[in-house]
C-alpha cells in the first residue's frame, strides 16, 4: 500500500496476497479519477456515472457484511460487523442521496439503470463470496473494497471545496475508517495464518483489485 503501510507485512496473509496485485493497486489509487477528485476538477458527468454505478454495490456490500455477522468465528468480530452496518445506512447512503440531488439525478435514473459490465462482474464476485459462506473469502473482498479506498482517500492532499467531492474523500479516510480497515486486515491475517494454500484467495484477490481499477474508468467511458 502507498499511504497505509500497516497491511503490507511480508509473511502475513494480506501482505502475501498484495504482492501479485501491486501494479493494479498502485494504478487504482493513483488513477485519473482520484487525482481529479482531489483537485476538484472532475467533470460532473464522470462523477455522476461513477456514483450511479457505485450505488448498485450497496446491496451486495450489505450482504457481505451480513454474511460476516453470520460466519465470523468470534463474537467480537460479529459485533464489529454489525456496528458497521449501521454506519453505512446513516452516512454513506446519506451522501448518495445528497450527491444525486446536487447532480440532478432523478430517482429512476439511479435505481433503474443498465449496469456496466464491470459493475456486474464486481457484483457477481461479491455475491459469490456471500454464497460461499466462507469468512476468509468475504474478508478478501472487504479488505480490498475498503483498504484500497482508504489508501487513496488518505493521500496528503488538500480537500476540494465542493461537498460532492470532499465528502466522498472524507468517507474513506480518518481514524474511524482506518480502524475499520485495520480490523479487516487483522481478521484476514488471523484466519489466514497457517493456511498452506492461498491459491483460491489469491485468485479472488487479484480479480477484485483488477475490477477496482477498471471501475474508475467507467465515468470516462460513458
Task: Give names to the regions the model predicted.
Residues 192-222:
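Long hydrophobic alpha-helical segments typical of transmembrane helices together
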Residues 49-60, 87, 114, 176, ...:
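Short, contiguous, pocket-lining structural segments
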Residues 76-179, 210:
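Active-site-proximal alpha-helical scaffolds that flank and shape metal-associated catalytic sites
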Residues 159-166, 189-198:
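Acidic interhelical loop/turn segments
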Amino acid at each position: 500500500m502507498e499511504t497505509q503501510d500497516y497491511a503490507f507485512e511480508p509473511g502475513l496473509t494480506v501482505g502475501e496476497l498484495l504482492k501479485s496485485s501491486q501494479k493494479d493497486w498502485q494504478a487504482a489509487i493513483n488513477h485519473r479519477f482520484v487525482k481529479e477528485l482531489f483537485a476538484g476538477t472532475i467533470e460532473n458527468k464522470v462523477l455522476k456515472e461513477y456514483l450511479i454505478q457505485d450505488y448498485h454495490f450497496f446491496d451486495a456490500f450489505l450482504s457481505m457484511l451480513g454474511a460476516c455477522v453470520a460466519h465470523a468465528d468470534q463474537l467480537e468480530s460479529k459485533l464489529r460487523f454489525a456496528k458497521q452496518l449501521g454506519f453505512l445506512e446513516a452516512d454513506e447512503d446519506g451522501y448518495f442521496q445528497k450527491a444525486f440531488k446536487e447532480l440532478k439525478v432523478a430517482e429512476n435514473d439511479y435505481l433503474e439503470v443498465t449496469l456496466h459490465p464491470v459493475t456486474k462482474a464486481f457484483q457477481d464476485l461479491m455475491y459469490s463470496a456471500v454464497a460461499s459462506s466462507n469468512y476468509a473469502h468475504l474478508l478478501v473482498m472487504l479488505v480490498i473494497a475498503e483498504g484500497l479506498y482508504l489508501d487513496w482517500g488518505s493521500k496528503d492532499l488538500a480537500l476540494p471545496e465542493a461537498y460532492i467531492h470532499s465528502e466522498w474523500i472524507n468517507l474513506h479516510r480518518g481514524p474511524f475508517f482506518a480502524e475499520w480497515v485495520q480490523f479487516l486486515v487483522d481478521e484476514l491475517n488471523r484466519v489466514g495464518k497457517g493456511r498452506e494454500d492461498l491459491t483460491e484467495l489469491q485468485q479472488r484477490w487479484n480479480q477484485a483489485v483488477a475490477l477496482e481499477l477498471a471501475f474508475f474508468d467507467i465515468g470516462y467511458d460513458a
